[in-house]
């Protein structure tokens, strides 16, 4: 099966359409030999689709009308937003009530109880997060951030998410507020909804009649603000109607009105989700089912449905969804979760000083930190004084004299390649309490592990992450090709000792007694005199980028065998124990089901999952592995996809790295490193706010 089209616009979206529809898309030109399973596609009911539709009829082939879904984009398509849904209707199209559509058929089909429950959960998430068609709306300074509950949205008087001027204007009167929704003149959804421009006038008259003492608010269409398109009602002289043309989140406006009047706008559907009375003066897809006050009728829509049944059809079953990071089809809940990850509160600080960052780090630090402050300032040393709306951010344990600074470090699933070879991190941990590897003082991660309640859903997610990590064998750096390892046939216990970089901050601040690879090997040999000790040096040491070599005497006495370019994940199935000072490999080994002994105090020690030579006194809680994994990989770090600029989940990064495979552990040449540095210099100088810089209002 293949798809064919003559539309250049559709072909331009080939990379997103193909995974959503699950078949290749081709340009229909010249003599094409079609098979009986092929499908011709066009975009909605645009005039240029008539030819291809007639072609399909002449050939006896199916014809699908394509459209954006109702949760359409992360960002706005005019500003590089990412498409996340597609409708492919083989019957008609949802906005044309003059003929049947697949959506109409789905709405009329009874749902299983499980599907209705799923739809109810989805409604709750859409309302809680403010998910809409174009998810591109910023918060405003001084807005109130409510609890995030669904009920918070329906409280009239909570003006969070509205521009301050509009919020002030709306609070000037206690009268009922009725929202009239304008649309672009000539929009195909108007005649498709059995309506005309006269129905907009009738809508205003009905609102006046039904609510004689109310304030009538006319919401203009966003596309009319620049003057390139005109609205049906906005051009009329309506003395008793207040124009609302402010750029604001649709839900922020919907939550402060008492009813919604529309002809065929999607705002009416979103009004239903928010529990508002909706009056329809056309026949949009959500009208005619007993959920709206309708001025028109459609004979085909002769059953009453519940809101969950409407949502199940319109948002779960009808559109196809795309994970824009992985480029593969997904479910609506996954898209909602991706959108939710882009939600960031308004900046906490006016100015954030990033101290001592090299030029190549500045580009990726901007991406990870821009949501924290209105202004990022890269400086060589900390400022002497800070105002109440300023903060300092430093790398790791640098500037230990700073008490309240944010400390940043690589995440636990970092990249495909070494940081010392200038591979950008896909994950960072930004900690306002301390830093996770410094066991001398508390950290944000330690506080999460000590005190954060982990729900059953979160434990299940932790278990799923463990299974995913075991399946794909993803680690922090993902260097060294997976190779076969032949376990020594000497009958002895096989103990893997993982080396680190001598002088590493995690050793100096997190290992009170054992502080070098050589000391570690001597300690393990003393504890395990009969074991076969397998030693794996740190990749940076192998690459020649850092120090950490051991003496010949230690090598002869303490090490039975070494591995260099075999990844740790290839060794875990064969070893009986892993010993380390503070290496992340201990955490990775726990995930892979290996017994772990720590000689320092890494973040994963002290929770009852490891054997600890020096257990940390502050860590009194006992955690299941799934909770440790959830809090460490989900709750603590931030993840970015550099291709799309989106905040992502650890699951997405794991799958992405698994697709990419492993990189070489060899040191990059000086020329290669300079090429990378120059690229980052250019990016730093030319950088503009990335797609992830938009923020959604929390209600």
Regions found by a protein language model. Name each.
Residues 1-699:
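Catalytic-core helical/loop segments in enzymes performing group transfer/polymerization on anionic/lipid-linked
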